[in-house]
């Protein structure tokens, strides 16, 4: 996915993240649907922001993709901030000097 979604549009964030994690696994929409026990047209509609999605289906998709459910709803901009902060923390010595 090229264009980052609006952080306030959770359906866009979910669609972006689903596609990102799915493509990173090398999966088609059909394969993700099979892994989740859902229909391919449902996965396609969610990725196109056509349908709202039940939390139980977010959990199924997250489990199939090997991520925590919250990661599907985390704006990519926030994920980058967390990764940057985590890297900064690892590089800085602790306050105790250890």
Question: Model segments located where?
Answer:
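Recognition helix of helix-turn-helix/homeodomain-like DNA-binding domains
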Residues: 37-53
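DNA major-groove recognition helix of helix-turn-helix/homeodomain DNA-binding modules
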Residues: 56-71
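A short, Lys/Arg-rich alpha-helix, primarily the initiator
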Residues: 1-24
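Short, charged recognition helix plus adjacent turn
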Residues: 74-98
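Conserved hydrophobic/aromatic packing and binding residues within compact polymer-binding modules
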Residues: 18, 32-33, 43-46, 72
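DNA major-groove recognition helix of helix-turn-helix
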Residues: 47, 57, 76
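Short basic helix-loop element that most often maps to the first helix and adjoining turn
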Residues: 16-35, 60, 87-88
């Amino acid at each position: 996915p090229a264009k980052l979604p609006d952080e306030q549009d959770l359906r866009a964030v979910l669609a972006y993240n689903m596609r990102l994690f799915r493509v990173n696994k090398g999966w088609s929409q059909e394969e993700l649907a099979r892994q989740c026990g859902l229909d391919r047209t449902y996965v396609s509609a969610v990725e196109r922001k056509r349908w709202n999605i039940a939390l139980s289906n977010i959990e199924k998709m997250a489990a199939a993709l090997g991520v925590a459910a919250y990661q599907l709803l985390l704006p990519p901009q926030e994920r980058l901030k967390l990764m940057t902060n985590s890297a900064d923390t690892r590089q800085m010595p602790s306050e105790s000097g250890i």
